[in-house]
């Protein structure tokens, strides 16, 4: 639904890569709605993925609203590593929204909040300075909380 809202903005294009749970649904939506602002690619090797990631303006993810557990998609580490601001939606109660939003590394909303997701996307699309700042904050978050060094310190401190 987000892509439909940006069909008239030629500077916005969605690229979906890999084999997620909803690939068939995505392809059906693209076909049924004749969406020209979405490209889907099957899984690519890691080298190609990182080359592509370097070209993206925003890293996006979506977790199904039916998830009952906490989930931290590995792609977020890639987004943070490449200083990409994060745009996402998560199931209600998922603390991932707090992690990203409190670090100002991006904007994560509830999966059922279509208007909130649109507004978040618009903020990131319309402001390169906000994208750059949030991307930097994401990189800082990665280094402070998710690097091997920081995790090693956490493990040692809990011994």
Question: Where is each model-derived feature located?
Answer:
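Nucleotide-activated donor-binding/catalytic signature segment of Leloir-type glycosyltransferases, i.e.
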Residues: 7-18, 23-50
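Nucleotide-sugar-dependent
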Residues: 45-52, 59-80, 86-98
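A short, well-ordered alpha-helix in the C-terminal region of glycosyltransferases
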Residues: 116-119, 123, 130-144, 154
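Alpha-helix C-terminal capping/helix-to-coil transition sites in glycosyltransferase folds
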Residues: 54-55, 102
